Amino acid sequence: MTRAIYLKAGGGYDNVFLGNLDISDPMNDEVQIRLHASSLNYHDYAVVSGVWGPSEQRIPMADGAGEVIKVGGAVKELKVGDHVCTTFFPGWLDGSPNVQGFETVPGDGIDGYARELVNLQTGSLTLAPDQWTHEQSATLTTAGLT
């Protein structure tokens, strides 16, 4: 069991609450991340405030950074102890994005990173820069590029 911040459907500051979340061990192609930081950007503000409120209950926050604490059996790219940051469009690693709206964006179309632990496929992560804090790394994928 871990904790998460939730946003009720439609958004709005009065619809944010702290709750519990069950988490299993990562699947064969996933890693488990202990999140240490998240950065706030306009997209998060718009979702939480209700400007772009979600159609169903959602864990907000599009960006996160933390440490790999468990690794699925098929994962070769990452290891326990690696510092990582999430990506705004999971699975988009290079080339032109194959994205339709915000359906795959954490904190909007899928649950985001306002939580303690998360299991993710490696295509949703990148190694954080050496010598950067989790707080600095959390700003890279959205806030750092806008």
Q: What function would you assign to each model-found segment?
A:
Residues M1-I5:
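Short structural boundary motif marking the start of a folded domain
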Residues Y6, G19, A46-S49:
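Short, acidic/hydrophobic/Gly-rich beta-strand patch recurrent on exposed beta strands
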Residues G11-V16, Y42-D44:
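Short N-terminal binding/cap micro-motifs at the start of the first secondary-structure element
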Residues N15-L18, G112:
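Residues that act as N-cap/strand-start positions at coil-to-secondary-structure junctions
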Residues L18, I23, A65-E67, L117-N119, ...:
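Conserved hydrophobic/aromatic beta-strand scaffold that supports enzyme active sites
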Residues I23-S38, V48-L93, G109-G112, P129-Q131:
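Glycine-rich beta-strand-centered segment in the early N-terminal region that forms part
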Residues S38-L40, G73, G123, L145:
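Alpha-helix/helix-capping structural signal
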Residues F89-T146:
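NAD(P)H dinucleotide-binding glycine-rich loop of Rossmann-like/cofactor-binding domains
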